[in-house]
Amino acid sequence: MKFLIDGMLGKLSRWLRIIGFDTKYLNNAIDDELIRIAFLENRILLTSDVELYRMAVAKGVDAFLIKGKTNFEKLAYLAKRFNIDLKVDENNSRCPVCGSKIKLVTKNKVKNKVPESTFKNYEKFWVCLNEECKKIYWHGSHWKRINEVLNKANTLKNSLSLEGSVENDKQ
């Protein structure tokens, strides 16, 4: 599954990348461009814009209207619709910044590229494979918060119903 996210859902793109989905985020694209790219690249268009959603569906593009105000609510609705297990898969995670694949590297590969205390305190490091990005990741203090949000979203997902909601209105 590949996603295309409009400008109103930028944070959602980061979450989807973290859990391993090929996610393109275009924050300044006009509606017609989003629809065209979603169609050409066979991506599911995610939006919170009802008008964009309806235009995409009318043009035969697979689209989903995201509900929710918080990250965990948005993730829960998306996970319910596409039967996504909201957990980090370290083998498939992508760079939350650019969307490229990340790779587990030996600790020595990041020496002098991360703060000394980080190098001393952590054993596992991942590097973005995009030559222009090359961000380095590790299980820092944010790791607990990431898992808390994903767990909360999974719990909410199990109590949701999509019946009769506008995202299922394909007319």
Question: Which residues make up each language-model segment?
Answer:
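Cysteine-rich micro-motifs
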Residues: E123-K135
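Short cysteine-rich clusters marking metal-coordination/redox-active sites
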Residues: C95-C98, C128-N130
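GST superfamily/GST-like fold recognition
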Residues: Y137-E148
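Short metal-coordination and nucleic-acid-contact micro-motifs, chiefly zinc-binding Cys/His arrays
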Residues: V88-N92, N121-K124
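Long, charged N-terminal interaction/targeting segments
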Residues: M1-E90
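Short functional micro-motifs and their immediate structural scaffolds
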Residues: S100-L104, C133-W138
